Amino acid sequence: MKKNIRRGITTRTTGSKRKGTPRGKGRSVQTIAFGTDGWRGKIAEDYTFDNVRRCTQGFAEYLMSGYSRRDLSRGVVVGGDRRFQSEHFAVAAAEVLAANRIPVHFCGGGVPTPVISFSVKARNAIAAINITASHNPPTDNGFKVRDENGGAVAPDGLKKIEKCIPANAAGIQRVNFQDAVARGLITQFNADEDYISQIKRMVDLEPIKKAGLKIVVDPMWGNGAGWFSRLLTGGKTEIIEIHEERNPIFPEMKRPEPIHPNIDAGLAYAKKAGADVVIFTDGDADRCGFADENGEFLDQLRVYGLLALYLLEVRNMRGAIVKTLSTTSMLESLGKLYDVPVYEVGVGFKFVAPKMIESDAVIGGEESGGYAFRGHVPERDGILAGLFFLDFMVTTRSKPSELLKRLFDKVGAHYYDRIDLVVDAGKKEKVLKRFHTQLPQQVAGLPVVRTNRMDGFKFILPDGSWLLIRFSGTEPLIRVYAEASSRDLLHTILADGEKLVR
């Protein structure tokens, strides 16, 4: 472990003020494990300032082992969301990086994840730390890391970071935030302008402004608040925002995730307002959801199909599509129609981002409403996805329901749903053991023609319908996913899936 004194920097260990007896020294502290998208925990239980500092120290050690001192001088972007104390946890992370002589570009709290990620590229940084629990319940917070491309760190990198995390608080380097600012180790900056310039390069906003649409935006009390208004005001289009204030309790929803029942209040408001379209962004604005002109929710698999169709048909782009195994088979159909490869990877952008870079993909995405695009950063961006969806509507002069019909005319109707079952660790292990010894031969009365064990257990049926059972890496959940060619078949598949894990 590195010493606590670095040349030219006075540092201190986290713990007791009594000299020589730092709190946590010699005491076992919980193991921190990174799931599909970083580390998350309950605030004041396992998600504490000491544990955030431990994570940051581990990340600093990881960076110092892989980069020269010259490259380290490019620095790390640090920001966070609107959750309870996020800006203070971000300060804690910045103090640790600075004490390790890694410069910090600090953008503070309330900054969307895609803005933080793009800042890595804009400021030529080597990485980012993002304090956010994304769509988790209000009791939680989280710690995301991003690489020098602004995308998720690959699984091998995450394992290395975990190994670098000190066993207790005694191994943490710290320097006072204001002292680090005075010494030039921490630079505070506004990340918005670089991102806005990038958005204007990616999509022409003027036709959307002039279209005269009525758009209801629900940022779900999160970081997406104000962004669509800021980008689209100045024309005939009207932007109406709800749930735009900061409120880390997330009233009127269980969590800031754009699925039922969290979207119900937004849908009810949009119907009364007569909206042409509804856009939801999750807590950190990297994921999104949409509802049509009738207030009907468009599930995220259909949205992925629509965004891919928009890029392939309206923009005439060509290139690979990267998808997680939990998202739609409509993408394979589009790949055949437009003669582009489709790559299926494990769940999480830690798998999607590296494959996007490797294949120069046009789009990459997952079933939870996260989509990334060529020419941007290999990171989910709910704001850019929302603007692309609006551009699809305006360019084709179509309502959302008409866009969906256009998609289904090409690939056939698809229906999707997901059930999340809260379980304890013992139940998870029991189900896993059963599946490793005996797999179902039939689902919904249909034979299983193929089983994919890449990430969980995916059972593919003869007509392309599928059931996926997987175990969350960040929450105590078993997730049951299904996609089918009819609603009735979908319900039967889901019911069978739920029985399999009971």
Regions found by a protein language model. Name each.
Residues K2-I5, K17-K19, R23-E95, A99-N100, ...:
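An N-terminal, well-structured beta->alpha segment
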Residues S28-V29, N141-A273:
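Gly/Ser/Thr-enriched, mixed-charge loops and adjacent short helices
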Residues D37, V78, I116, I129, ...:
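Buried hydrophobic positions in well-ordered alpha/beta secondary-structure cores of metabolic enzymes
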Residues S65, R69, G75-D140, R230-A291:
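N-terminal small/polar loop signature for handling phosphorylated ligands or for N-terminal nucleophile
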Residues V78-R82, V217-P219, D292, G375, ...:
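Short glycine-centered, acidic/aromatic-flanked micro-motifs in structured strand/loop junctions
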Residues V104-P114, F297-Q300, V322-T324, V345-G346:
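Active-site nucleophile and cofactor-binding loops and adjacent substrate-binding regions
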Residues D276-V277, E313, M317-R502:
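Phosphate-binding and adjacent anionic-ligand microenvironments
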